[in-house]
UniProtKB/Swiss-Prot annotation:
Name of the protein described by the UniProt record: Arginine--tRNA ligase
The family this protein is said to belong to: Belongs to the class-I aminoacyl-tRNA synthetase family.
UniProt xrefs under SMART domains: Arg_tRNA_synt_N, DALR_1
GO MF term set: arginine-tRNA ligase activity; ATP binding
Entries under Pfam families matching the protein: Arg_tRNA_synt_N, DALR_1, tRNA-synt_1d
Originating gene: argS
């Protein structure tokens, strides 16, 4: 319905433009159609008159009246308009148009909620990107679910989406994995070596070492004893593949897939870092220099060495950034620069990264580098994911023996379910820390949000099954012949208005990259349905009212199903 209101107001604006009431060069930015919280203010409210009043040299309320007078009649959408406050125009939608929402939902079925705000724009969503050095933890899981659901929402809103996992297979952390596995490998042959400080604890390292021994026997033993801090790349590749197998299994449990797995090592081996630096050099964005000590670091503890620096401050960053150290090695940031240039060179028009909150300090520098490399601002958006606190019985959940320092994602999924994990990880905005109650996540009561929403879907299925059992001739496929005019009570209007809101929620979640808007909406819709069900009879009423209400709740079921599908959560027929 919002689109219909926008079209009506656009017609009125064009009429006043043609009459010269609104100047031809009027700036239309800032005009918003909103849904008033107070029902007495109508179904929609628009601020056009207040935005254009000064440009039209009129009082806002006077311009509002001219706009109302210029609205086309006979559209069957608006029953009346009211001018309120300083110049808002409030629209009251006709009952017929409201009932038409139910038909629209059922006609469009699984496509209801889809839009085209993305207009086919090519978007790359990079998420998870956990180091291949150990099992995934719940923080990784929250980022995985957020990225996957955001990708689904963007697709629903008309974007052409690709999903990518950046495999950090060339950094310091994989070097630590190599040393950790090599020590455990030696222990399996009876060498009395201790796990050095800084190496990875946890039984999973022993599992990798055992698999390595089974595969290669003592092939690496001589090398390991001769060079305790060294390891062959072949051995490291094997260790990373073992971890990657676990990571892919964890993602499969959550039904998360990727279109691309991009190797950081390839940036080095294929000369992509040198290419990125050459592009920056050609644009005059590099220089040899010495950085000042970071804030809070004493100057005497800071080694000032000449490095190759990027003029990040010219592109909105706080300080210039090092790309190549004085010893000739590249910084981690250099690989980030090369990777993001590669994304742009692949033709993506918008980049979205899902990062842990601890990477927040990297956002501005990567955005600055992309701006310098491409000449485009706002190419990269970053969604930061805060921590997850696990509790059971009101107490924090202790660390995993297998991981050594944290609870693995696999353990959480096995203790609850994929549905629970996916819904709960989106039960708060990504910028807020999340408390995940493992007991509540499996509870079959209304305090468990995923159960509450799924139960609404299952309850509607049960009502329809009962109707069929009692001989009601109405079929789900035959709803179009049902007279919806009996719908008109307050709770029915509330449900219909919430159904109409769903496409706007999807669009807002896509534009603002806030996937948690979907579960928030579903909880609200489920609450409205449960309230309606508890206060209204559906079966034990006259046939006309019964059939209209059956069709109404069928539309509710469809929208709940569409929302749960966006979340990657099942839509059970019974519970």
């Amino acid at each position: 319905m919002r689109q219909s209101i926008e079209e009506l107001m656009e017609h009125a604006q064009n009429t006043l433009l043609a009459e010269g009431v609104i100047p031809a060069d009027a700036k239309l930015g800032g005009i918003k159609v909103e849904r008033p919280k107070d029902k007495s203010h109508g179904d929609f409210s628009i601020n056009t008159a207040m935005v254009l009043a000064k440009q039209a040299r009129m009082k806002p309320r006077d311009l509002a009246q001219r706009l109302v007078d210029a609205l086309p009649s006979g559209q069957g959408v608006v029953s009346r308009c009211e001018i309120a406050g300083p110049g808002f125009i409030n629209f009251f939608v006709t009952p017929e148009r409201l009932r038409g929402v139910v038909a629209d939902v059922l006609q469009r079925g699984g496509s209801y909620g889809q839009g085209n705000v993305g207009a086919g724009q090519k978007v790359l969503v990079e998420f998870v990107s956990a180091n291949p050095t150990g099992p995934m933890h719940v923080g990784h899981g929250r980022g995985a679910v957020t990225g996957d659901v955001l990708a689904r929402i963007l697709e629903c809103a008309g974007y052409a989406v690709q999903r990518e996992y950046y495999l950090n297979d060339a950094g310091v952390q994989v070097q630590v994995l190599g040393r950790s596995v090599m020590l455990r490998y030696r222990q399996l042959f009876g060498d009395a070596v201790e796990v050095a400080e800084g190496c990875y604890p946890g039984d999973y390292v022993v599992d990798i070492a055992r698999a390595l021994k089974e595969k290669d026997q003592d092939k690496w033993l001589e090398v390991a004893r001769a060079e305790p801090d060294e390891y062959p790349r072949e051995m490291l590749e094997f260790a990373m593949q073992q971890v990657l197998t676990w990571i892919k299994a964890d993602l499969a449990r959550l039904n998360i897939r990727f279109d691309h797995w991009f190797s950081e090592f390839s940036l080095h081996s294929e000369g992509r870092i040198e290419h990125a630096l050459e592009v920056l050099s050609q644009k005059g964005c590099l220089y040899e220099g010495v950085l000042e000590p970071p804030k809070g670091k004493k100057s005497e503890a800071w080694a000032s060495r000449p490095q190759l620096l990027f003029k990040a401050t010219d592109f909105g960053d706080e300080v210039d950034r090092a790309l190549r150290k004085s010893d000739g090695s590249y910084t981690y940031f250099a690989a980030d620069v090369a990777y993001h240039l590669n994304k742009a060179e692949r033709g993506f028009e918008r980049l979205v990264n899902i990062w842990g909150a601890d990477h927040g300090g990297y956002v501005r520098r990567v955005q600055a580098a992309l701006g310098a490399l491409t000449g485009k601002q706002n190419l990269l958006d970053v969604v930061l994911i805060q921590m997850v606190n696990l509790t059971r019985g009101g107490e924090p959940v202790k660390m995993s023996k297998r991981a050594g320092t944290f609870v693995t994602l696999e353990e959480v999924v096995e203790a609850t379910s994929s549905d629970a994990v996916r819904f709960w990880f989106l039960s708060r905005g990504s910028g807020a820390q999340l408390d995940f109650d493992l007991d509540l996540a499996v509870a079959k009561n209304n305090d468990n949000p995923v159960y509450y929403v799924q139960y609404a879907h299952a309850r509607i299925c049960s009502i329809w099954d009962k109707a069929q059992h009692e001989g009601v001739a109405l079929q789900a496929q035959g709803w179009s012949g049902v007279d919806l005019s009996p719908l008109g009570e307050g709770a029915e209007w509330d449900l219909i208005r919430k159904l109409d809101l769903f496409p706007d929620v999807v669009e807002g979640a896509a534009v603002h990259q806030e996937p948690h808007r979907i579960p928030y909406y579903l909880l609200d819709l489920a609450a409205a349905f449960h309230t309606f069900y508890n206060s209204h009879r559906i079966m034990d009423v006259d046939a006309g009212t019964r059939d209209a209400r059956l069709v109404l709740i069928l539309a509710v079921k469809q929208v709940i199903a569409n929302g749960l599908e966006l979340l990657g959560v099942q839509q059970p027929r019974s519970m």
